[in-house]
Amino acid sequence: MTLRFTIMGCGSSGGVPRPALGWGACDPNNPKNRRRRTSLLVERRNAKGTTRVLVDTPPDLREQLLDAEVDGLDGVLFSHEHADHTHGIDDLRAIAIHRRALVNVYLDEGTASVVKARFGYCFETPPGSEYPPILREHRMTAGQAIDIAGAGGSITALPFAQEHGDILSLGFRFGALAYSCDLKGLPPDSVAALGGIDVWIVDALRHAPHPSHFSVAEALEWIGRIKPRRAILTNLHSDLDYEALRATLPASVEPAFDGMRIEA
């Protein structure tokens, strides 16, 4: 089974450029330096249609869905509750209206409690409102695979735990590719879950150390441990110019850019 992956956004929490703060070290003339907040689209296609799974709903989701010409989603996976990964959740409303069906979303216990406190109206009509809910909630747990059905066939996602400052985030393995957008470390079970992957899309926030994200050097160290055939760095801050960063990386490692597509 070959899946197609689209980097919907590869920027850090403020994106690139940032309001009032600009482009940082990034060349504004290179389109690959314009970065929306991180998200990943996974697609499986056959003669009957396409199955689509989205990872995270960043604040830029509306533009991301328009650019990728997404008119339906069979499932949405949430890596964790931080604003840059959840605050575009209301943009799923258009998908629900178009499909005339609730959008299936998958969250772990901690993420669900925070997201439902912030966006409860997406899951249940609040008192005094006439607006129907737009989401159907499903619980997920690290280490337990999820099968999401659709017209193009089933997509299997294996969530795995990641250390992300004072919380745990989730990474996801889809067949030969794994996605680790926000992390500072991996527990042993998650290292085992990454065994034998071909492609790893992995957090590399900046050159300087950070308390809850891999630096570029830490990402490269972990890539050396996991040993994917190919690695793609994401969640890139404004001090990481695309061409300057790429020139420093090993041949099997490259920076992500918005709209990048991978098959695995």
Predicted segments with their positions:
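Binuclear metal-ion centers of metallo-dependent hydrolases, dominated by the metallo-beta-lactamase
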Residues: 143, 187-264
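A conditional alpha-helix N-cap/helix-loop micro-motif detector
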Residues: 33, 58, 183, 209-216
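Thr-Gly-centered strand-to-loop micro-motif
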Residues: 159-160, 180-182, 202, 233-234
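Catalytic metal-binding/acid-base residues of hydrolase active sites
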Residues: 60, 82, 184, 205, ...
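Binuclear metal-dependent hydrolase catalytic cores
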Residues: 1-180, 189, 246-264
